[in-house]
Amino acid sequence: MVLMIVSGRSGSGKSVALRALEDMGFYCVDNLPVVLLPELARTLSERQISAAVSIDVRNMPESPEVFEQAMNNLPDAFSPQLLFLDADRNTLIRRYSDTRRLHPLSSKNLSLESAIDEENDLLEPLRSRADLIVDTSEMSVHELAEMLRTRLLGKRERELTMVFESFGFKHGIPIDADYVFDVRFLPNPHWDPKLRPMTGLDKPVAAFLDRHTEVHNFIYQTRSYLELWLPMLETNNRSYLTVAIGCTGGKHRSVYIAEQLADYFRSRGKNVQSRHRTLEKRKS
């Protein structure tokens, strides 16, 4: 059984995530004090029910040791996973402005900007041990729920999921990435007027990139690097490995390379997902 702990900065989508998990059959509890986690897990273990619990800055323990002790006291029947939701500062400010809700730390007479920054510092112990960090800055409510359903229902328990995502540097580097590879030095289909409207998912763009030796070399060396360290990452009790591939706009080169790497590791029997940030943004 899974004990999914949902945390993250206020306004990043914890309530949405908890509702999505409830739809997936999890027994959900909002804002449970950390010290009560073992007791809840023992109660649910008798009923063979997976659980999801949200923890925010209001019920954070005073020291990380309290959280570690609670994790160590969980029944063996439960496999704990920590999901951390985040968004960039400007997005959080905009969301609070749209909803006109008060930030949980506003009672300390802090400005909204200062409350967001302080919350980030207070939640760092949880963020640093998260199994999965999700950046919701560019996601709608429905996109976040669907992404969680895909990632959580599409993976086998305790198996590392490799996530290959493309992005454009001009839109910013994904904060959920474990590895970031820059492919802006590779030949750019953008300068071919016929290829410019297309994406890295289209065959003419793929054929253009496939003609260049340096593209093949990059794919080979990148997958070799990942293959070298993958066994150690798998034995390190990780649930996800997110590899971000970036080009200038996130439309051609990064999309093609991310798909090539995803196809390669998928053919090797790995649990693989792919995502293209710029293309998803264009659809929304």
Swiss-Prot record:
Query: RNA-binding: present as a keyword of the record?
Result: yes
Answer whether the UniProt record assigns the keyword Acetylation to this protein.
no
Q: Which InterPro entries match?
A: P-loop_NTPase, RapZ-like, RapZ-like_N, RapZ_C
> For ATP, which residues are the binding ones?
8-15
SUPFAM superfamilies from the entry? P-loop containing nucleoside triphosphate hydrolases
Q: Which domain of life is it from?
A: Bacteria
List the coiled-coil residues: none
Q: Which UniProt keywords apply?
A: ATP-binding, GTP-binding, Nucleotide-binding, RNA-binding
List positions binding GTP.
56-59
**Residues spanning the membrane:** none
GO MF: ATP binding; GTP binding; RNA binding
For the region RNA-binding, give the residue spans.
Answer: 266-284
Identify the Gene3D superfamilies for this entry: P-loop containing nucleotide triphosphate hydrolases
User: Which family is this sequence assigned to?
Assistant: Belongs to the RapZ-like family. RapZ subfamily.
The record's note on quaternary structure and interaction partners says:
Homotrimer.
Role summary:
Modulates the synthesis of GlmS, by affecting the processing and stability of the regulatory small RNA GlmZ. When glucosamine-6-phosphate (GlcN6P) concentrations are high in the cell, RapZ binds GlmZ and targets it to cleavage by RNase E. Consequently, GlmZ is inactivated and unable to activate GlmS synthesis. Under low GlcN6P concentrations, RapZ is sequestered and inactivated by an other regulatory small RNA, GlmY, preventing GlmZ degradation and leading to synthesis of GlmS.
- What is the name attached to this protein's record? RNase adapter protein RapZ
What's the source species for this entry?
A: Cronobacter sakazakii (strain ATCC BAA-894) (Enterobacter sakazakii)
Gene this chain is encoded by: rapZ
